[in-house]
């Protein structure tokens, strides 16, 4: 499942600096929003009963990450349009309620299943988890299905105490009333500034607007993927189609994240919709494994957020016989597809890391088992020294070897005499011995990768064991410090 060595990309100017964005679906949209009111600050507010135009450039325009073109693993599926609306049985909406401190972009989204959908989730390991995370975990522990997911950007509703929990429950109650579905069928996600109460006077009216505007269009799916972003410079969405049990199954996803990204869920939100018929137990098991192989294998800056959440829905509307055998071929195929979608989105988050000029992919083989290999790969992509060296086009393989060596915990430590290490096409170490290599050519490889915001590939073998794993990160630039010195988290 290795990404290409570089990504074809366009270049745009962002905040005075050059930033690469994926070529393809650009979100260049031009339409009108009807039934708006202009406030004293010039902010357009859509009132209840109004029709939202999901192709309004002012609200929903954001470049597209090259998930389908470069980052999605290959498999027996094809890419289709539609994002989270590609699967049968789902509608979405997006809206600007006014929750962001600055900017004109929409800031809330709704994903709605036509009927009860099998639901599974994985969440942050941070003990300071946000109120919406607690609500989600409680809801999913109580029943295997859900109908709606309400997401907001701009305010995290984390470290807000009892009042924050009350706000979360109030938003769920408002959506329940607007949709006519039970509160226990509603899930919540939030992302944004930590430690401040939600702007309930703005959010609550926006909830009914969302409920009135759900649709299953490509434009709505792209609008939702844009609305949930914070410091992201690109929206992250993808959809695929494959055959399971003689039926066409579709799966789509969207994610947000650019900073505060670290293994064991990071400030990332992910949503996947699927129309396969699958038992709750199987769906939860494969969601857990797919998340472990993808979102838990990325890091931008080593900070694990309070709000990290991945929620996956399965509507069952594809018409296939329900998948109940966890060890069967159909369950394996469904898991492969879900893992691919999650990997594509997770890699897009690392690709879009704050200030990044490239994605770093570390592939580890020869470990005692897959988990050991993943631990080693994570250690390498988390190394600030290695990340800085790659940004500086310095083929400093010692930093890579060092990071592999201190990886912990692993069940079986590897011998340095077995270490093999390559940077792109350049082999730097074999069986623990440094090799003569063309440092100028290796530096040129790094420059070529960063010039196109491509993929820097690090291959490591630690022995002859059966374990293999991957992790993804990004380089560490001056821009990362600038962004986070100026942005309140």
Residue map of PLM features:
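Intrinsic-disorder/low-complexity loop/linker signature
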Residues: 16, 41-43, 246
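A structural signal for small-residue-enriched, beta-sheet-centric alpha/beta enzyme cores
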Residues: 49-170, 176-489
